[in-house]
Amino acid sequence: VELRIDSYFPGSEGDAEDTLRIETLRSLIADCPLPVILTCRSAEEGGDYDGDESDRVSLLEKLCVNVEHPPAYLDFELAAYQRSANIRQKINLCVDHPKQQRDVRTRLILSMHDFDQRPSDLMRRLADAWAEPAASVVKFAYRCRSIRDNLEIFEILRDAPKPTIGLGMGEFGLMSRVLAPKFNGFLTFASLRDSAATAPGQPTISDLLGMYRTRSIGKDTRVYGVIGWPVTQSMSPLIHNAGFEARGWDGVYLPMPVAADASDIELSAHSVGVTVNQMMDARKIRWCGASITIPFKEAIEHDAFASHVVRDPNEDVIDIGAANTLAVRDRGEGFPIVDLYNTDATAISALLQDAMERVSGSKIVVVGAGGVALAAGHSIVSRGGKLIVAARRLEQATALVERLNGPTVWDDEPGGSFRGEAKAVKLDELLERPADVYINCTPVGMTGGPDPEGLSIPVHDLAGTLPPETVFFDTVYNPIETPMLKAAREHGFRTIDGVEMFVRQAVAQFELWTGEQAPMQLFDRLVRERLGG
Protein backbone atom coordinates (compact mmCIF):
# COMPACT_ATOMS: atom_id res chain seq x y z
CA VAL A 1 0.00 0.00 0.00
CA GLU A 2 1.38 3.40 -0.94
CA LEU A 3 0.63 6.20 1.52
CA ARG A 4 0.74 9.45 -0.46
CA ILE A 5 1.16 12.00 2.31
CA ASP A 6 2.06 15.05 0.20
CA SER A 7 -1.50 16.43 0.25
CA TYR A 8 -1.79 15.68 3.99
CA PHE A 9 1.47 17.47 4.74
CA PRO A 10 1.84 20.15 2.03
CA GLY A 11 4.61 21.97 3.92
CA SER A 12 3.59 25.48 2.91
CA GLU A 13 1.22 26.16 5.80
CA GLY A 14 3.58 25.98 8.80
CA ASP A 15 0.82 24.07 10.55
CA ALA A 16 1.18 23.93 14.35
CA GLU A 17 -0.47 20.52 14.28
CA ASP A 18 2.44 18.84 12.50
CA THR A 19 3.20 16.72 15.56
CA LEU A 20 -0.35 15.37 15.59
CA ARG A 21 -0.14 14.64 11.88
CA ILE A 22 3.09 12.72 12.33
CA GLU A 23 1.56 10.60 15.09
CA THR A 24 -1.45 9.90 12.87
CA LEU A 25 0.83 8.78 10.04
CA ARG A 26 2.86 6.56 12.38
CA SER A 27 -0.37 4.90 13.48
CA LEU A 28 -1.47 4.37 9.87
CA ILE A 29 1.84 2.70 9.02
CA ALA A 30 1.77 0.55 12.17
CA ASP A 31 -1.83 -0.56 11.64
CA CYS A 32 -1.49 -1.38 7.94
CA PRO A 33 -1.57 -5.17 7.40
CA LEU A 34 0.45 -4.82 4.17
CA PRO A 35 3.93 -3.42 3.46
CA VAL A 36 3.81 0.37 3.14
CA ILE A 37 5.48 2.58 0.55
CA LEU A 38 5.77 6.06 2.08
CA THR A 39 5.69 8.88 -0.49
CA CYS A 40 5.67 12.63 -0.02
CA ARG A 41 5.79 13.63 -3.67
CA SER A 42 7.20 17.04 -4.54
CA ALA A 43 5.16 19.44 -6.65
CA GLU A 44 7.87 19.54 -9.33
CA GLU A 45 7.30 15.82 -10.00
CA GLY A 46 3.51 15.85 -9.94
CA GLY A 47 2.80 15.80 -6.20
CA ASP A 48 1.25 18.31 -3.80
CA TYR A 49 4.20 19.07 -1.52
CA ASP A 50 5.44 22.60 -2.27
CA GLY A 51 7.19 23.42 1.00
CA ASP A 52 10.79 23.59 2.08
CA GLU A 53 12.87 20.55 1.16
CA SER A 54 14.50 20.32 4.57
CA ASP A 55 11.06 20.16 6.20
CA ARG A 56 10.06 17.31 3.90
CA VAL A 57 13.19 15.33 4.68
CA SER A 58 12.73 15.99 8.40
CA LEU A 59 9.20 14.59 8.18
CA LEU A 60 10.46 11.45 6.46
CA GLU A 61 13.14 10.98 9.11
CA LYS A 62 10.53 11.14 11.87
CA LEU A 63 8.47 8.45 10.14
CA CYS A 64 11.35 6.11 9.27
CA VAL A 65 14.03 6.41 11.98
CA ASN A 66 13.77 5.18 15.58
CA VAL A 67 10.16 4.06 15.20
CA GLU A 68 8.76 0.64 16.05
CA HIS A 69 6.90 0.25 12.75
CA PRO A 70 8.74 1.97 9.90
CA PRO A 71 7.46 1.80 6.32
CA ALA A 72 8.80 -1.02 4.16
CA TYR A 73 9.82 1.45 1.44
CA LEU A 74 10.50 5.15 1.14
CA ASP A 75 9.95 6.69 -2.32
CA PHE A 76 12.17 9.71 -2.97
CA GLU A 77 12.89 11.50 -6.25
CA LEU A 78 16.27 10.96 -7.88
CA ALA A 79 16.52 14.65 -8.84
CA ALA A 80 16.08 15.81 -5.23
CA TYR A 81 18.41 13.08 -3.99
CA GLN A 82 21.18 14.21 -6.35
CA ARG A 83 20.64 17.93 -5.79
CA SER A 84 22.15 18.15 -2.30
CA ALA A 85 24.74 16.12 -0.41
CA ASN A 86 23.01 17.06 2.85
CA ILE A 87 19.63 15.75 1.66
CA ARG A 88 21.27 12.62 0.29
CA GLN A 89 22.94 11.98 3.64
CA LYS A 90 19.69 12.42 5.56
CA ILE A 91 17.72 10.14 3.22
CA ASN A 92 20.47 7.52 3.54
CA LEU A 93 20.01 7.63 7.32
CA CYS A 94 16.35 6.62 6.77
CA VAL A 95 16.99 3.54 4.64
CA ASP A 96 18.89 0.28 4.61
CA HIS A 97 21.99 0.16 2.41
CA PRO A 98 25.46 -1.49 2.43
CA LYS A 99 27.05 1.21 4.64
CA GLN A 100 24.11 1.62 7.01
CA GLN A 101 25.22 1.12 10.62
CA ARG A 102 21.82 1.46 12.27
CA ASP A 103 19.12 -1.16 12.51
CA VAL A 104 17.05 0.24 9.64
CA ARG A 105 14.52 -1.85 7.71
CA THR A 106 13.11 0.72 5.27
CA ARG A 107 14.37 0.38 1.70
CA LEU A 108 14.76 3.22 -0.77
CA ILE A 109 12.86 3.58 -4.05
CA LEU A 110 14.64 6.20 -6.18
CA SER A 111 12.05 7.58 -8.59
CA MET A 112 11.74 9.87 -11.59
CA HIS A 113 8.60 11.21 -13.28
CA ASP A 114 7.85 13.18 -16.44
CA PHE A 115 4.20 14.09 -17.01
CA ASP A 116 4.83 15.51 -20.49
CA GLN A 117 6.96 13.05 -22.46
CA ARG A 118 9.73 10.48 -22.45
CA PRO A 119 12.79 12.27 -21.02
CA SER A 120 15.56 12.62 -23.58
CA ASP A 121 18.11 11.62 -20.91
CA LEU A 122 16.06 8.72 -19.52
CA MET A 123 18.81 6.11 -19.87
CA ARG A 124 21.39 8.35 -18.19
CA ARG A 125 19.04 8.95 -15.26
CA LEU A 126 18.33 5.25 -14.97
CA ALA A 127 22.04 4.45 -15.01
CA ASP A 128 22.59 6.93 -12.17
CA ALA A 129 19.74 5.44 -10.13
CA TRP A 130 20.82 1.84 -10.71
CA ALA A 131 24.38 2.74 -9.68
CA GLU A 132 23.30 4.26 -6.37
CA PRO A 133 24.12 1.74 -3.58
CA ALA A 134 21.36 3.05 -1.30
CA ALA A 135 18.63 2.40 -3.89
CA SER A 136 16.94 -0.98 -3.43
CA VAL A 137 14.41 -0.25 -6.18
CA VAL A 138 14.38 2.19 -9.11
CA LYS A 139 11.15 3.67 -10.44
CA PHE A 140 10.57 5.60 -13.65
CA ALA A 141 7.30 6.90 -15.07
CA TYR A 142 6.65 9.11 -18.07
CA ARG A 143 3.76 10.06 -20.32
CA CYS A 144 3.44 7.66 -23.24
CA ARG A 145 2.72 9.12 -26.65
CA SER A 146 2.17 5.81 -28.43
CA ILE A 147 2.12 2.04 -27.98
CA ARG A 148 5.84 2.08 -28.88
CA ASP A 149 6.68 3.82 -25.59
CA ASN A 150 5.30 0.80 -23.71
CA LEU A 151 7.54 -1.52 -25.69
CA GLU A 152 10.62 0.47 -24.65
CA ILE A 153 9.50 0.31 -21.01
CA PHE A 154 9.29 -3.48 -21.29
CA GLU A 155 12.79 -3.67 -22.79
CA ILE A 156 14.17 -1.60 -19.91
CA LEU A 157 12.42 -3.73 -17.28
CA ARG A 158 13.65 -6.94 -18.87
CA ASP A 159 17.30 -5.82 -18.82
CA ALA A 160 17.30 -3.85 -15.54
CA PRO A 161 20.24 -4.70 -13.21
CA LYS A 162 18.17 -4.25 -10.05
CA PRO A 163 14.44 -4.32 -9.14
CA THR A 164 12.73 -1.67 -11.25
CA ILE A 165 9.26 -0.17 -11.64
CA GLY A 166 8.50 1.14 -15.13
CA LEU A 167 5.17 2.82 -15.86
CA GLY A 168 3.62 4.69 -18.77
CA MET A 169 1.27 7.53 -17.91
CA GLY A 170 -1.78 8.67 -19.83
CA GLU A 171 -4.16 6.86 -22.16
CA PHE A 172 -1.34 5.20 -24.12
CA GLY A 173 0.38 3.83 -21.01
CA LEU A 174 -2.15 1.34 -19.65
CA MET A 175 -0.38 -1.59 -21.31
CA SER A 176 2.76 -0.95 -19.24
CA ARG A 177 0.76 -1.03 -16.02
CA VAL A 178 -1.14 -4.23 -16.75
CA LEU A 179 1.74 -6.19 -18.29
CA ALA A 180 4.35 -5.22 -15.67
CA PRO A 181 4.45 -8.79 -14.23
CA LYS A 182 5.26 -10.19 -17.68
CA PHE A 183 8.52 -8.24 -17.83
CA ASN A 184 9.79 -8.49 -14.23
CA GLY A 185 8.31 -5.17 -13.14
CA PHE A 186 8.84 -4.91 -9.37
CA LEU A 187 5.25 -3.74 -8.97
CA THR A 188 2.52 -1.71 -10.62
CA PHE A 189 0.13 0.91 -9.27
CA ALA A 190 -3.66 1.12 -9.10
CA SER A 191 -6.09 3.52 -7.43
CA LEU A 192 -8.96 2.67 -5.12
CA ARG A 193 -11.30 4.53 -7.48
CA ASP A 194 -11.02 6.72 -10.57
CA SER A 195 -11.11 9.96 -8.57
CA ALA A 196 -8.21 8.79 -6.37
CA ALA A 197 -5.71 8.17 -9.18
CA THR A 198 -2.26 9.60 -8.43
CA ALA A 199 -1.19 9.60 -12.09
CA PRO A 200 -3.03 9.94 -15.42
CA GLY A 201 -4.06 6.60 -16.90
CA GLN A 202 -3.84 4.73 -13.60
CA PRO A 203 -6.39 1.88 -13.51
CA THR A 204 -8.53 1.14 -10.50
CA ILE A 205 -7.58 -1.82 -8.35
CA SER A 206 -10.88 -3.52 -9.23
CA ASP A 207 -10.06 -3.30 -12.96
CA LEU A 208 -6.43 -4.33 -12.51
CA LEU A 209 -7.15 -7.37 -10.34
CA GLY A 210 -10.62 -8.18 -11.66
CA MET A 211 -10.97 -7.41 -15.35
CA TYR A 212 -7.27 -7.66 -16.27
CA ARG A 213 -6.39 -10.39 -13.69
CA THR A 214 -2.88 -9.00 -13.41
CA ARG A 215 -1.91 -11.53 -10.72
CA SER A 216 -2.30 -14.34 -13.24
CA ILE A 217 -0.14 -12.66 -15.91
CA GLY A 218 3.18 -14.37 -16.59
CA LYS A 219 5.88 -14.52 -19.25
CA ASP A 220 3.80 -16.88 -21.42
CA THR A 221 0.53 -14.93 -21.21
CA ARG A 222 -0.88 -14.15 -24.67
CA VAL A 223 -1.75 -10.51 -25.33
CA TYR A 224 -4.75 -9.26 -27.32
CA GLY A 225 -6.33 -5.84 -27.64
CA VAL A 226 -8.70 -3.44 -29.33
CA ILE A 227 -7.02 -1.07 -31.80
CA GLY A 228 -8.87 2.16 -32.51
CA TRP A 229 -9.15 5.87 -31.78
CA PRO A 230 -10.58 6.38 -29.26
CA VAL A 231 -10.87 3.07 -27.36
CA THR A 232 -11.22 4.09 -23.70
CA GLN A 233 -14.96 3.34 -23.63
CA SER A 234 -14.75 -0.01 -25.44
CA MET A 235 -16.50 -2.91 -23.73
CA SER A 236 -14.35 -5.49 -25.51
CA PRO A 237 -11.81 -5.76 -22.63
CA LEU A 238 -14.66 -6.51 -20.23
CA ILE A 239 -16.03 -9.47 -22.18
CA HIS A 240 -12.88 -10.96 -23.69
CA ASN A 241 -11.01 -10.99 -20.38
CA ALA A 242 -14.03 -12.62 -18.73
CA GLY A 243 -14.07 -15.16 -21.55
CA PHE A 244 -10.38 -15.97 -21.10
CA GLU A 245 -10.97 -16.54 -17.39
CA ALA A 246 -14.06 -18.69 -18.00
CA ARG A 247 -12.20 -20.92 -20.45
CA GLY A 248 -8.92 -21.04 -18.53
CA TRP A 249 -7.12 -19.31 -21.40
CA ASP A 250 -3.80 -17.68 -20.46
CA GLY A 251 -4.50 -14.37 -22.16
CA VAL A 252 -5.19 -10.72 -21.41
CA TYR A 253 -7.03 -8.18 -23.59
CA LEU A 254 -6.18 -4.46 -23.47
CA PRO A 255 -7.22 -1.15 -25.02
CA MET A 256 -4.61 -0.25 -27.66
CA PRO A 257 -5.14 3.35 -28.75
CA VAL A 258 -3.55 4.43 -32.02
CA ALA A 259 -3.89 8.12 -32.84
CA ALA A 260 -5.47 8.70 -36.24
CA ASP A 261 -7.20 11.17 -38.52
CA ALA A 262 -10.48 9.59 -39.61
CA SER A 263 -10.57 11.86 -42.67
CA ASP A 264 -7.23 10.56 -44.00
CA ILE A 265 -7.42 6.81 -44.62
CA GLU A 266 -3.85 6.59 -45.94
CA LEU A 267 -2.41 8.25 -42.84
CA SER A 268 -4.58 6.05 -40.61
CA ALA A 269 -3.42 2.96 -42.49
CA HIS A 270 0.19 4.01 -42.02
CA SER A 271 -0.30 4.63 -38.28
CA VAL A 272 -1.96 1.29 -37.60
CA GLY A 273 0.51 -0.53 -39.86
CA VAL A 274 3.49 0.84 -37.93
CA THR A 275 1.89 -0.14 -34.62
CA VAL A 276 1.02 -3.67 -35.73
CA ASN A 277 4.54 -4.13 -37.09
CA GLN A 278 6.07 -2.96 -33.80
CA MET A 279 3.87 -5.29 -31.77
CA MET A 280 4.76 -8.25 -33.97
CA ASP A 281 8.48 -7.45 -33.71
CA ALA A 282 8.28 -7.40 -29.90
CA ARG A 283 8.22 -11.21 -29.69
CA LYS A 284 8.48 -11.33 -25.88
CA ILE A 285 5.04 -9.74 -25.61
CA ARG A 286 3.46 -12.72 -27.36
CA TRP A 287 0.88 -10.58 -29.15
CA CYS A 288 -1.68 -12.90 -30.73
CA GLY A 289 -4.55 -10.80 -32.03
CA ALA A 290 -6.71 -7.70 -31.92
CA SER A 291 -10.13 -6.28 -32.59
CA ILE A 292 -10.06 -3.42 -35.10
CA THR A 293 -12.50 -0.57 -34.63
CA ILE A 294 -13.07 3.00 -35.87
CA PRO A 295 -11.31 4.45 -37.85
CA PHE A 296 -9.15 1.50 -38.92
CA LYS A 297 -11.58 -1.10 -40.30
CA GLU A 298 -11.06 0.02 -43.88
CA ALA A 299 -7.56 1.42 -43.33
CA ILE A 300 -6.26 -2.05 -42.52
CA GLU A 301 -7.04 -3.13 -46.10
CA HIS A 302 -5.22 -0.11 -47.55
CA ASP A 303 -1.89 -0.48 -49.36
CA ALA A 304 -0.26 1.78 -46.75
CA PHE A 305 -0.99 -0.88 -44.11
CA ALA A 306 0.33 -3.64 -46.35
CA SER A 307 3.63 -1.76 -46.74
CA HIS A 308 4.34 -2.46 -43.06
CA VAL A 309 2.74 -5.86 -42.43
CA VAL A 310 2.52 -9.20 -44.23
CA ARG A 311 -1.21 -9.94 -44.22
CA ASP A 312 -3.59 -12.66 -45.34
CA PRO A 313 -7.19 -11.41 -45.59
CA ASN A 314 -9.98 -13.96 -45.78
CA GLU A 315 -12.56 -13.90 -48.57
CA ASP A 316 -15.06 -11.71 -46.69
CA VAL A 317 -12.39 -9.08 -46.03
CA ILE A 318 -11.36 -9.06 -49.70
CA ASP A 319 -14.98 -8.65 -50.83
CA ILE A 320 -15.90 -6.06 -48.22
CA GLY A 321 -12.65 -4.13 -48.19
CA ALA A 322 -12.71 -3.86 -44.40
CA ALA A 323 -11.61 -5.96 -41.43
CA ASN A 324 -12.44 -5.85 -37.74
CA THR A 325 -10.34 -8.79 -36.52
CA LEU A 326 -6.65 -9.53 -36.67
CA ALA A 327 -4.97 -12.81 -35.71
CA VAL A 328 -1.20 -13.22 -35.61
CA ARG A 329 0.07 -16.51 -37.04
CA ASP A 330 3.63 -17.82 -37.24
CA ARG A 331 4.28 -18.84 -40.83
CA GLY A 332 7.46 -20.70 -39.92
CA GLU A 333 11.03 -19.78 -38.99
CA GLY A 334 9.75 -17.10 -36.64
CA PHE A 335 8.16 -14.93 -39.34
CA PRO A 336 4.65 -13.86 -38.26
CA ILE A 337 1.78 -13.08 -40.61
CA VAL A 338 -1.48 -11.29 -39.90
CA ASP A 339 -4.74 -13.04 -40.78
CA LEU A 340 -7.61 -10.59 -41.31
CA TYR A 341 -11.31 -11.32 -40.77
CA ASN A 342 -14.60 -9.43 -40.69
CA THR A 343 -16.70 -10.81 -37.85
CA ASP A 344 -19.23 -7.99 -38.26
CA ALA A 345 -20.32 -9.81 -41.43
CA THR A 346 -20.28 -13.14 -39.57
CA ALA A 347 -22.47 -11.72 -36.80
CA ILE A 348 -25.00 -10.11 -39.14
CA SER A 349 -25.32 -13.31 -41.16
CA ALA A 350 -25.91 -15.39 -38.03
CA LEU A 351 -28.52 -13.00 -36.63
CA LEU A 352 -30.42 -12.79 -39.92
CA GLN A 353 -30.33 -16.57 -40.21
CA ASP A 354 -31.80 -16.86 -36.69
CA ALA A 355 -34.51 -14.29 -37.37
CA MET A 356 -35.71 -15.51 -40.79
CA GLU A 357 -36.57 -18.74 -42.47
CA ARG A 358 -34.13 -17.79 -45.21
CA VAL A 359 -32.19 -14.75 -46.33
CA SER A 360 -32.24 -15.78 -49.99
CA GLY A 361 -34.98 -13.91 -51.82
CA SER A 362 -35.82 -11.67 -48.85
CA LYS A 363 -35.89 -7.93 -49.34
CA ILE A 364 -33.59 -6.24 -46.80
CA VAL A 365 -32.95 -2.52 -46.30
CA VAL A 366 -29.60 -1.32 -44.94
CA VAL A 367 -29.51 2.30 -43.78
CA GLY A 368 -26.03 3.81 -43.89
CA ALA A 369 -22.98 3.74 -46.13
CA GLY A 370 -20.04 3.09 -43.79
CA GLY A 371 -18.03 0.02 -42.85
CA VAL A 372 -20.80 -1.74 -40.92
CA ALA A 373 -23.27 -1.09 -43.76
CA LEU A 374 -20.75 -2.60 -46.17
CA ALA A 375 -20.41 -5.72 -44.00
CA ALA A 376 -24.20 -6.01 -43.75
CA GLY A 377 -24.62 -5.55 -47.49
CA HIS A 378 -22.04 -8.23 -48.23
CA SER A 379 -23.75 -10.66 -45.83
CA ILE A 380 -27.07 -10.11 -47.55
CA VAL A 381 -25.95 -10.19 -51.19
CA SER A 382 -23.66 -13.19 -50.72
CA ARG A 383 -26.60 -15.16 -49.33
CA GLY A 384 -29.01 -14.28 -52.10
CA GLY A 385 -30.88 -11.48 -50.38
CA LYS A 386 -32.39 -8.53 -52.24
CA LEU A 387 -30.50 -5.54 -50.86
CA ILE A 388 -31.65 -1.92 -50.73
CA VAL A 389 -29.03 0.53 -49.46
CA ALA A 390 -30.48 3.82 -48.21
CA ALA A 391 -28.45 6.91 -47.35
CA ARG A 392 -29.13 10.63 -47.01
CA ARG A 393 -27.22 11.20 -50.22
CA LEU A 394 -27.83 8.88 -53.15
CA GLU A 395 -24.18 8.97 -54.23
CA GLN A 396 -23.14 7.44 -50.87
CA ALA A 397 -25.57 4.56 -51.26
CA THR A 398 -24.57 4.11 -54.90
CA ALA A 399 -20.88 3.95 -54.00
CA LEU A 400 -21.58 1.16 -51.50
CA VAL A 401 -23.63 -0.80 -54.04
CA GLU A 402 -20.82 -0.43 -56.58
CA ARG A 403 -18.31 -1.82 -54.09
CA LEU A 404 -20.56 -4.84 -53.59
CA ASN A 405 -21.55 -5.45 -57.19
CA GLY A 406 -19.24 -3.60 -59.53
CA PRO A 407 -20.44 -0.75 -61.80
CA THR A 408 -23.97 0.41 -61.09
CA VAL A 409 -26.72 0.13 -63.71
CA TRP A 410 -29.43 2.78 -63.37
CA ASP A 411 -33.03 1.57 -63.51
CA ASP A 412 -36.06 3.46 -64.76
CA GLU A 413 -37.41 4.24 -61.29
CA PRO A 414 -36.87 7.86 -60.22
CA GLY A 415 -33.89 8.22 -57.87
CA GLY A 416 -33.05 4.50 -57.84
CA SER A 417 -30.18 2.42 -59.12
CA PHE A 418 -29.39 -1.27 -59.05
CA ARG A 419 -27.19 -4.05 -60.28
CA GLY A 420 -28.41 -7.60 -59.86
CA GLU A 421 -30.09 -7.80 -56.45
CA ALA A 422 -28.70 -4.58 -54.90
CA LYS A 423 -30.26 -1.13 -55.19
CA ALA A 424 -29.31 2.31 -53.93
CA VAL A 425 -31.95 4.82 -52.83
CA LYS A 426 -32.18 8.05 -50.90
CA LEU A 427 -33.25 7.71 -47.28
CA ASP A 428 -36.46 9.67 -47.78
CA GLU A 429 -37.66 7.09 -50.34
CA LEU A 430 -37.89 4.21 -47.85
CA LEU A 431 -41.68 4.51 -47.63
CA GLU A 432 -41.83 3.41 -51.25
CA ARG A 433 -39.66 0.34 -50.53
CA PRO A 434 -41.40 -2.05 -48.11
CA ALA A 435 -39.00 -4.77 -46.97
CA ASP A 436 -38.75 -7.86 -44.77
CA VAL A 437 -35.86 -6.52 -42.67
CA TYR A 438 -34.57 -3.03 -41.88
CA ILE A 439 -31.02 -2.64 -40.52
CA ASN A 440 -29.68 0.62 -39.11
CA CYS A 441 -25.93 0.98 -39.67
CA THR A 442 -25.66 4.67 -38.76
CA PRO A 443 -24.90 6.33 -35.36
CA VAL A 444 -28.40 7.84 -35.23
CA GLY A 445 -29.89 6.98 -31.83
CA MET A 446 -26.51 6.32 -30.20
CA THR A 447 -25.74 7.73 -26.76
CA GLY A 448 -23.21 10.52 -27.26
CA GLY A 449 -23.72 10.40 -31.03
CA PRO A 450 -24.76 13.21 -33.37
CA ASP A 451 -28.50 12.51 -33.00
CA PRO A 452 -29.19 10.41 -29.86
CA GLU A 453 -32.95 11.06 -29.94
CA GLY A 454 -33.27 10.58 -33.68
CA LEU A 455 -35.20 7.89 -35.51
CA SER A 456 -32.81 6.17 -37.92
CA ILE A 457 -35.67 4.49 -39.82
CA PRO A 458 -39.20 6.03 -40.12
CA VAL A 459 -40.91 3.16 -38.28
CA HIS A 460 -44.15 5.03 -37.53
CA ASP A 461 -44.64 5.94 -41.18
CA LEU A 462 -43.85 2.40 -42.34
CA ALA A 463 -46.02 0.67 -39.73
CA GLY A 464 -49.24 0.70 -41.71
CA THR A 465 -47.67 -1.04 -44.70
CA LEU A 466 -45.70 -3.85 -43.01
CA PRO A 467 -46.70 -7.23 -41.51
CA PRO A 468 -45.87 -7.93 -37.81
CA GLU A 469 -43.12 -10.42 -38.71
CA THR A 470 -41.03 -7.58 -40.18
CA VAL A 471 -37.64 -7.36 -38.43
CA PHE A 472 -36.00 -4.12 -37.29
CA PHE A 473 -32.30 -4.53 -36.50
CA ASP A 474 -30.13 -1.80 -34.92
CA THR A 475 -26.34 -2.11 -34.88
CA VAL A 476 -26.14 0.63 -32.20
CA TYR A 477 -25.79 -1.02 -28.78
CA ASN A 478 -25.75 2.00 -26.46
CA PRO A 479 -28.51 2.48 -25.51
CA ILE A 480 -29.78 -1.08 -25.74
CA GLU A 481 -33.20 0.19 -26.78
CA THR A 482 -32.65 2.91 -29.35
CA PRO A 483 -35.50 5.20 -30.44
CA MET A 484 -35.87 3.08 -33.59
CA LEU A 485 -36.16 -0.20 -31.65
CA LYS A 486 -38.56 1.35 -29.16
CA ALA A 487 -40.83 2.48 -31.99
CA ALA A 488 -40.65 -0.96 -33.65
CA ARG A 489 -41.63 -2.73 -30.42
CA GLU A 490 -44.52 -0.33 -29.88
CA HIS A 491 -45.87 -1.39 -33.27
CA GLY A 492 -45.39 -5.08 -32.52
CA PHE A 493 -42.53 -5.74 -34.94
CA ARG A 494 -39.70 -8.18 -34.25
CA THR A 495 -36.41 -6.59 -33.20
CA ILE A 496 -32.69 -7.35 -32.95
CA ASP A 497 -30.70 -5.00 -30.72
CA GLY A 498 -27.09 -3.92 -31.11
CA VAL A 499 -25.93 -5.89 -28.08
CA GLU A 500 -26.78 -9.11 -29.93
CA MET A 501 -24.58 -8.05 -32.84
CA PHE A 502 -21.74 -6.83 -30.62
CA VAL A 503 -21.76 -10.12 -28.72
CA ARG A 504 -21.94 -12.28 -31.87
CA GLN A 505 -18.99 -10.54 -33.51
CA ALA A 506 -17.01 -10.84 -30.26
CA VAL A 507 -17.88 -14.55 -30.03
CA ALA A 508 -16.49 -15.07 -33.53
CA GLN A 509 -13.30 -13.20 -32.61
CA PHE A 510 -12.81 -15.19 -29.41
CA GLU A 511 -13.18 -18.49 -31.25
CA LEU A 512 -10.76 -17.44 -34.00
CA TRP A 513 -8.11 -16.55 -31.42
CA THR A 514 -8.52 -19.44 -29.00
CA GLY A 515 -10.14 -22.32 -30.87
CA GLU A 516 -12.43 -22.59 -27.83
CA GLN A 517 -16.20 -22.14 -27.71
CA ALA A 518 -16.94 -18.62 -26.51
CA PRO A 519 -19.19 -18.14 -23.44
CA MET A 520 -21.83 -16.20 -25.40
CA GLN A 521 -24.35 -15.94 -22.55
CA LEU A 522 -21.64 -14.52 -20.27
CA PHE A 523 -20.70 -11.94 -22.91
CA ASP A 524 -24.34 -10.91 -23.34
CA ARG A 525 -24.98 -10.62 -19.60
CA LEU A 526 -21.86 -8.53 -18.97
CA VAL A 527 -22.65 -6.04 -21.74
CA ARG A 528 -26.27 -5.63 -20.68
CA GLU A 529 -25.27 -5.18 -17.04
CA ARG A 530 -22.69 -2.55 -17.96
CA LEU A 531 -25.25 -0.69 -20.08
CA GLY A 532 -27.86 -0.95 -17.34
CA GLY A 533 -30.25 -3.07 -19.37
Spell out what each predicted region is.
Residues 79-222:
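Catalytic alpha/beta core domains of metabolic enzymes, predominantly
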Residues 168, 223-231, 342-345, 352, ...:
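Glycine-rich adenosine-cofactor-binding loop
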Residues 382-386, 491-493:
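Conserved S-adenosyl-L-methionine
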Residues 385-414:
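NAD(P)-binding Rossmann-fold cofactor-contacting core
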Residues 414-495:
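Rossmann-like adenosine-cofactor binding region
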